[in-house]
Amino acid sequence: MITVATAECFTLGKIGTTIHKIASGYEECKNHRYYNIINGNVKIISSSFIPSIEGAEKLLNLGAPLPKCDYEYSYSKAYTEKNDLKVAHILAKGLKNSLNCNIAIATTAGVGRGGICIISDKNEYLFTTDIEGDLISKKNIIQRQKNGIDKTINKFVEILKKEYFL
């Protein structure tokens, strides 16, 4: 069984929840296009929505502080796209090290297309959504979120096929 963990910000835990529901055989997911790949082969060992720096640092035992936010925004992390990519990588690495899972997925997005990182047992994948968004002004954040969820799950399944031969 391939173990998976997520640390999500702008995707609000929906990647981990979706994978969990498919993996667990929820009735509503039995017709999902990836059901036959995920169900019976994958299990979620942790799925977290972590919007704050403090939460990420404490939960994931990062060992070093995350970068200072590029933007002031309530209590959530808010970075440029460049720093979102760095932070997503740090979060995924912390998650993989803390939980010793096969695949760690992390997402974060402030201003720009956001940052997504998937770390498998063999490789690291760092990418963005296809949608420019702005957490501060709330511009395109729902569209960016949906795109990020879809793109990440598609990439996750691509990794399962390529690296785990499913």
UniProtKB/Swiss-Prot annotation:
Give the matching Pfam families: HcgF
All disulfide bonds of the chain are: none
Which parts form a coiled-coil structure per UniProt? none
- Give the stretches traversing the membrane: none
Task: Report the superkingdom from the record.
Answer: Archaea
Q: Which family does it belong to?
A: Belongs to the UPF0254 family.
Q: Which NCBIfam families match?
A: PRK00962.1
Name of the protein in its database record? UPF0254 protein Maeo_0668
User: What species is this protein from?
Assistant: Methanococcus aeolicus (strain ATCC BAA-1280 / DSM 17508 / OCM 812 / Nankai-3)
The major lineage groups are: Archaea, Methanobacteriati, Methanobacteriota, Methanomada group, Methanococci
